[in-house]
Amino acid sequence: MLEFNNSTPLTMGVELELQIVNRRDYNLTRGSDDLLQIINKTEHGYDIKPEITESMIEIATAVHTDHVEMLAELTAMRTLLVTAANKLNLGLAGGGAHPFQHWEDQRIYPTDRYRLVSELYGYLAKQFTVYGQHIHIGCASGDDAIRLTHLLARQIPHFIALSASSPFYQGVDTSFQSSRLTSINAFPLSGTMPFVSDWEAFNTYFIKMSHLGIVASMKDFYWDIRPKPEYGTVEIRVCDTPLAIETAVALGAYAQTLSKYYFAHTELEPTQDTYLTYSYNRFQACRFGLNGALINPITGTQSSIKDDILQTFELLKDVAEELGTTDAIELLRQRVLSGQSDADWLRASYEKSGSLSDAVRQQSAVWMAT
């Protein structure tokens, strides 16, 4: 049985997976161990660890109630990482996928779990060299987490479109705003959580899956959004890692604001109909970003993802003011109004220079704030 470790509602944290690149041609490089060795010479107290392949590193914030404090922590973590990277002549970058790396060149990081993943999933494990942002929102109970997971599913296309930063893959313009999520689609336990009504029903489902030998823990579910019982949170997993930490923090604040709205409006009940249009809306967000179409499964009406986001921001105005997230929502609103995503910025960088290496150089300069 899974125990849900109840946490303070609306606390939040983010995890960011970062690209490690060389400074010759800005391809990925196996630098995570060297980076960690330098970083761990200081007693920094931050959560910085390797990821599934050696050209990735993950940073995770502490638990926060205030997005401004979260930005301050991420800024300090960035300074620590950039100092270490400079000593090794390495670059660090955001972005959901490296524009021209080849998956077969990657090497699995040597931990027991990653070896098991590699043995089970074969080449998919190396293809998992993609870079995402995960957002955690605290919940008072397992029942609250199940409800919030279903309600936030409606806004998953928002998070995809707002964070989209992976237009290139293996040297090719994919025509997608976020190509990263297609790498995750291949895993058999990706997609969405089944439509269960409460924590007891979820436990029944988990126990069945465990007895069938399909899963051993919650880590085996690669769902877009899932409860995280050991943290007492709901975890949104669809975001590409943004090019800048300010965007990452704003996305966390948006999730916090949405969650506050849903917690306050207890009359809003999840409906299974949300999932009728889920895959369609998700694809539209990945392929077209802000310009994608979004079908409301309840009303049957269709709008652009851009317009739906702006309407949601308007709906959340009072909640954002109460929570103190107005500035973060405004940052995202201005991005939406400009119609420019990180993916568009990367395409423009490539068009200007004609070189994907130079585009990654600029991408790295943005994250490292150099």
UniProtKB/Swiss-Prot annotation:
It catalyses: L-cysteine + L-glutamate + ATP = gamma-L-glutamyl-L-cysteine + ADP + phosphate + H(+). It is an enzyme of class 6 (ligase). Belongs to the glutamate--cysteine ligase type 2 family. YbdK subfamily. ATP-dependent carboxylate-amine ligase which exhibits weak glutamate--cysteine ligase activity. This is Putative glutamate--cysteine ligase 2. GO terms for molecular function: ATP binding; glutamate-cysteine ligase activity. NCBIfam families: gshA_cyan_rel, PRK13516.1. Its EC number is 6.3.2.2. It comes from Herminiimonas arsenicoxydans. One of its GO terms (biological process) is modified amino acid biosynthetic process. Keywords: ATP-binding, Ligase, Nucleotide-binding.
